[in-house]
UniProtKB/Swiss-Prot annotation:
Record keyword Transport present: yes
Major localisation: membrane
Keyword Transcription regulation: no
Protein role: Carrier protein involved in proton-driven auxin influx. Mediates the formation of auxin gradient from developing leaves (site of auxin biosynthesis) to tips by contributing to the loading of auxin in vascular tissues and facilitating acropetal (base to tip) auxin transport within inner tissues of the root apex, and basipetal (tip to base) auxin transport within outer tissues of the root apex. May be involved in lateral roots and nodules formation.
Annotated source species: Medicago truncatula (Barrel medic)
GO cellular component, as recorded: plasma membrane
UniProt-recorded name of the protein: Auxin transporter-like protein 4
Species lineage: Eukaryota, Viridiplantae, Streptophyta, Embryophyta, Tracheophyta
Tissue expression profile of the protein: Shoots and roots of nodulating plants, at low levels.
Compartmental location: Cell membrane
Membrane topology (Cytoplasmic): 1-59, 101-135, 194-196, 254-266, 336-356, 400-422
Family matches, as Pfam families: Aa_trans
Length: 482
């Protein structure tokens, strides 16, 4: 077996390799040192902290605005319990993905496979460990989930900006932000999201605490009612939105690949989740306390919070963060497309950006067809997130280490808090059964029922989903007619 140090070796990204290839004189190096250090500080991130910021920033984006809506469907107690429950099992399956990545990496390096100019992805890990059928399964679910994850960010951009400027309808804003988000084609990999991840987490932190404080200061609305849960359809729809919230680890492999020492990732997602709890729980609790059942008809919390400079700042910061999260969701799709057309090892940023553009077009189109901010989260959570980041990783881990020899030679042994392979298998089996029955089964039924109801109510290509009807022009007074 390879040593741990060998398993931890990082793959240098295309940008680093391009910069370091070729000879330079000592004088030239000295001249460029300060500029290089500044550029590296902003552009090249492969540390544990970079991974933590990426995980935390990516995990909580526009869902922050829909969690109060989920609380109105679930009720206060169930909302809090489901957040903690899905946060913990999401952290566990992210840990499983990291273990399988390290196992795959170690086996391939033992075979002297060179990953220069190649970003390892989840479907390749499944292919190397379990074969081509698992590769196809992973590729189908991962790409479809990330596609709709990008769609959701685009819908959220249009939904949010409307609360600052309602002179344009949400569909027009979707056109505009689709063009803006397309600029993410210029970001080569997760290695280059250092400054964006840091800023993104700061933006969501501000927004979460603004929501909590604004709701408390505003107080409860008159005759507020907290009747949830009232219907099974709403209950499981809300639960599935929370499952979606803590299912942001579909990009775990790409984040690990950007690290200098990927094996240190093991508990990063869990630590990121703990921080995310400090944002999602207080904000959702406070907004639901203030507005109660009114949230059932307002999936975006911004629509109920008082309009002022603080809210406008939160909207703008969330817009920027959704641009970042769009890049997080879309970058793995860019990699897949590059590999399909044979351009993945291209070093030119401009050429790579050009060949990536076709990926954005279907995302743009789908965001215009299904502009249902809120309900679409639950539908994606039930049908895609359940398999992509919960069921498939748990099953893959069980099958990879099903033999005694595989367990004996495993690069990563069971964690100290769960030292028995039997306990690991029991936990994995529980996750598979729970998510399959509750998440995919009940959640799928509830989410699709709610989603179809939105289509029946608003129609496909809805011009302005959940917008207030325009105020009819006032008739002129009798005196004005003379």
């Amino acid at each position: 077996m390879l040593s741990q140090n060998q398993a931890e070796e990082a793959i240098v990204t295309n940008m680093n390799e391009t910069e370091q290839e070729g000879g330079s004189s000592l004088e030239e190096i000295a001249e460029d040192q300060s500029m290089f250090n500044f550029k590296s500080f902003l552009w090249h991130g492969g540390s544990v902290w970079d991974a933590w910021f990426s995980c935390a920033s990516n995990q909580v984006a526009q869902v922050l605005l829909t969690l109060p809506y989920s609380f109105s469907q679930l009720g206060m107690v169930s909302g809090i319990v489901f957040q903690i429950f899905y946060g913990l099992i999401g952290s566990w399956t992210a840990y499983l993905i990291s273990v399988l990545y390290v196992e795959y990496r170690a086996r391939k390096e033992k075979e002297n496979v060179n990953f220069k100019n190649h970003v390892i992805q989840w479907f390749e890990v499944l292919d190397g460990l379990l074969g081509r059928y698992w590769k196809a399964l992973g590729l189908a679910f991962n790409c479809t989930f990330l596609l709709f994850g990008s769609v959701i960010q685009l819908i959220a951009c249009a939904s949010n900006i409307y609360y600052i400027n309602d002179k344009l309808d949400k569909r027009t804003w979707t056109y505009i932000f689709g063009a803006c988000c397309a600029t993410t084609v210029f970001i080569p990999s997760f290695h280059n999201y250092r400054i964006w991840s840091f800023l993104g987490l700061g933006m969501t932190t501000y927004t979460a605490w603004y929501m909590a404080i604004a709701a408390i200061v505003n107080g409860q609305i008159e005759n507020v009612v907290h009747s949830g849960p009232t219907k099974l359809v709403l209950y499981f729809t809300g639960a599935t939105n929370i499952l979606y919230t803590f299912g942001g680890h579909a990009v775990t492999v790409e984040i690990m690949h950007a690290m200098w020492k990927p094996q240190k990732f093991k508990y990063i997602y869990f630590l990121a989740t703990l921080y995310v709890f400090t944002l999602t729980i207080p904000s959702a609790v406070a907004v639901y306390w203030a507005f109660g059942d009114e949230l059932l008809n307002h999936s975006n919390a911004f629509s109920l919070l008082p309009k002022n400079g603080f809210r406008d700042a939160a909207v703008i910061l969330m817009l920027i963060h959704q641009f970042i999260t769009f890049g997080f969701a879309c970058t793995p799709l860019y990699f897949v497309w590059e590999k399909v057309i044979g351009m993945h090892d291209t070093k030119s940023i401009c050429l790579r950006a050009l060949v990536r553009l076709p990926v954005v077009i279907p995302i743009w189109f789908l965001a215009i067809i299904f502009p249902f901010f809120g309900p679409i989260n639950s539908a994606v959570g039930a049908l895609l997130v359940t398999f992509t980041v919960y069921i498939i990783p748990a099953l893959a881990h069980m099958l990879t280490y099903r033999t005694a020899s595989a367990r004996k030679n495993a690069v990563e042994k069971p964690p100290s808090f769960l030292p028995s392979w039997t306990a690991v298998y029991v936990l994995n089996a529980f996750i598979v059964v729970w998510v399959l029955v509750v998440g995919f089964g009940f959640g799928g039924w509830a989410s699709m029922t709610n989603f179809i109801r939105q289509i029946d109510t608003f129609g496909l290509f809805a011009k302005c989903y959940q917008c207030k009807p325009p105020t009819p022009p006032q008739a002129p007074s009798p005196h004005a007619r003379h």
